[in-house]
A protein has these predicted regions:
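Bacterial N-terminal signal peptides that target proteins for export
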Residues: 3-17
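Short beta-strand-centered segments that line the small-molecule binding cleft or hinge
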Residues: 123
Length: 331
């Protein structure tokens, strides 16, 4: 009898020890990755990043643990890509077109009136993805997924009838391309870091703002601007990426899992963006912001100016960029 009890105790001890060893092994060999993001934690992009991290943790059985660091958590918006590129932090999220100092190809999805719907934006992404991945790889960064913001419009304090109504008004360019486009419209650029944008808007330092309907909550736009013009000008993508050095520390199994999760999150994100756009437009109306469709004349004036921007981009980008543009135009 005593021998049987001793065997049962020993068996139970061995099982407990085995569980503890497994837990210890997982904790010791877990790869913990920090991921700073530039957006408020309640934005749909931030929520996608959080779901991505949670799913990766679950499907790798805690071997890969991603910690999403919300806005103002240590890295400024403009510092994130460089920090990942130089392996100072493992992962990050950034507006692709704001990285145009890294490559002119990153301006592609912000070319005004090139891709003005989700379908067009996705087609543009498909034809350019391989080139984007190659440019990022050269910079020691791997693309995981890309999701667009809703289409860009224009916030104004006063009603706009023609482009003459925009001349001399201040705006914040968030890339070289938006700077060029804004200037072509007669706007005056004002440099405002992203982390200072909400304050600049509240102090009425900007007369107009390019942004989607979903930008209002993040920066308090509805408290300052009376109109939002639904230009459908472009759909800029937010990208999530990892340093190549950190990527190569993952096993092939975990790499496959991360890419699988990223693909699902990307697909979910494009749908979430559409929903965020619809919800944000309703919220703008609730906040007494007038949603305006530009007149036929005004839209035509915007498009004529955009052609000059696209032509200049094509002149500067070189053969690889023109090839991507031509493939898209043939779709």
């Amino acid at each position: 009898m005593g021998s049987l009890v001793e065997k049962q105790i020993l068996t139970r001890f061995v099982k407990i020890a085995a569980v503890l060893i497994i837990l210890l092994f997982n904790n010791v060999y877990a790869l913990e990755l920090k991921m700073p993001i530039a957006n408020n934690i309640d934005s749909f992009h931030s929520q996608l990043a959080i779901r991505f991290a949670a799913q990766v943790k679950k499907e790798t059985n805690n071997r890969v643990i991603i910690t999403v660091l919300a806005k103002d958590s240590g890295y400024k918006d403009e510092e994130i890509f460089g920090a990942v590129k130089n392996d100072l932090v493992a992962m990050g999220s950034r507006l692709l077109s704001s990285l145009d100092h890294e490559s002119q190809l990153f301006q592609l999805d912000a070319l005004p009136f090139l891709a003005t719907s989700y379908r067009d934006a996705f087609n543009l992404y498909k034809v350019s993805k391989a080139e984007l991945e190659q440019v990022l790889k050269i910079k020691e960064v791997k693309l995981l997924y890309a999701v667009p913001w809703p289409s860009q419009g224009l916030y104004t304090r006063n009603k706009i009838e023609t482009l003459d109504d925009l001349k001399g008004l201040s705006f914040r360019p968030y890339s070289k391309l938006t700077d060029l486009f804004g200037k072509s419209l007669g706007l005056e650029p004002v440099i405002v870091p992203l982390d200072k944008l909400a304050r600049a808007i509240s102090r009425k330092q900007l007369d107009v703002v390019f942004g989607s309907a979903a930008s209002s909550n993040e920066f308090g736009l509805s408290r300052v601007f009376s109109y939002w013009y639904n230009l459908d000008a472009w759909l800029p993508k937010e990208i999530v990426f990892i340093s190549m050095k950190q990527w190569l520390t993952l096993s092939s199994e975990d790499q496959a899992i991360v890419l699988s999760v990223a693909q699902r999150i990307e697909s979910e994100g494009w749908q979430s963006s559409k929903q965020a756009s619809d919800n944000a437009k309703a919220q703008l109306e609730f906040s007494n912001v007038k949603l305006e469709e530009p007149s036929v004349q005004l839209r035509q004036e915007f498009k004529l100016k955009s052609l000059l921007v696209v032509e200049q981009w094509l002149e500067n980008i070189g053969d690889h960029g023109r090839d991507v543009w031509e493939r898209y135009m043939k779709l």
